[in-house]
Every structure is written in structure tokens, then in C-alpha cells.
A protein has these predicted regions:
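His-Asp phosphorelay/catalytic-motif detector in bacterial-type signaling
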Residues: 4, 48-50, 75-80
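Charged docking surfaces used in two-component/phosphorelay signaling
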Residues: 18-26
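Short, glycine/charged-rich "phosphate-handling" switch motifs in NTP-dependent
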Residues: 102
């Protein structure tokens, strides 16, 4: 039996993490959660995640810094990252894309749009 793909959701809002978690689990994904970028790096060191979904504006370590750290790390530099954020400005989107974000979803979001983006980026 194939192991479920694991997704790390990083957001300082527990309600956003809950909505994303429920939508992803319904489609068979395992979900790990973190409230900020620093916590996410700790989780990544302990668990093999197939994809990261991250907010941009968070305390301790923001999502763009997290994205840059992920792309620098030899063990997970190829892990796709989706930015899920209220940041809709083109400058921030360009910064995210330049740092390696594979998708940019603006909050408020439809859970199915997030699930579709995850499905496209996780390679079987």
C-alpha cells in the first residue's frame, strides 16, 4: 500500500491551518502543522514532507525567509512550496517566485483550489 504524501502547513492562524488540514486530509494527505517559519524548519528536520504550504506574514520567521531557507537546505531544496497569504501585491508575489515559490494563493481561499494546487505539485 502506498504511503500518503505528507504536507506541512505553516500559518500563524490556527483557523487557516484547520481549514487547509481538513481539506487535505479529506483527499488522503497526511498533514503536519507549524505556526511560524522557525517551527516549520524544525518540523522539516524531523519529518519528510512532500510539499510545504506557507503564509507570508508570520511572527518569528516570515514565509519568504522560510522559503529561502528551504531552497538552501540540501535535504529539502526540491520540496515544492505554495504561498497561501493575504499578500496580493505583485512585488511580494515576484519576491516569492524569485525565492522559489511554485504557486501563490491569496486568502481568503477556496479549499478546493488549494487541494488542486497541491495535487498538481506533488509527484507520485
Amino acid at each position: 500500500m502506498e504511503m500518503a504524501k505528507k504536507v506541512l502547513i505553516v500559518d500563524d492562524s490556527s483557523s487557516v491551518r484547520t481549514v487547509a488540514r481538513l481539506a487535505l486530509r479529506e483527499k488522503g494527505y497526511d498533514v503536519v502543522e507549524a505556526a511560524n517559519g522557525q517551527e516549520a524548519l524544525t518540523k522539516l528536520d524531523g519529518e519528510r514532507c512532500h510539499l510545504v504550504i506557507s503564509d507570508v506574514n508570520m511572527p518569528v520567521m516570515d514565509g519568504i525567509t522560510l522559503l529561502k531557507e528551504i531552497k538552501r537546505h540540501p535535504n529539502y531544496k526540491f520540496t515544492p512550496v505554495i504561498m497561501l497569504t493575504t499578500e496580493a501585491g505583485e512585488d511580494k508575489k515576484q519576491e516569492g517566485r524569485a525565492a522559489g515559490a511554485k504557486a501563490w494563493i491569496t486568502k481568503p481561499f477556496q479549499p478546493q483550489i488549494l487541494v488542486d494546487a497541491v495535487s498538481k505539485l506533488i509527484v507520485a
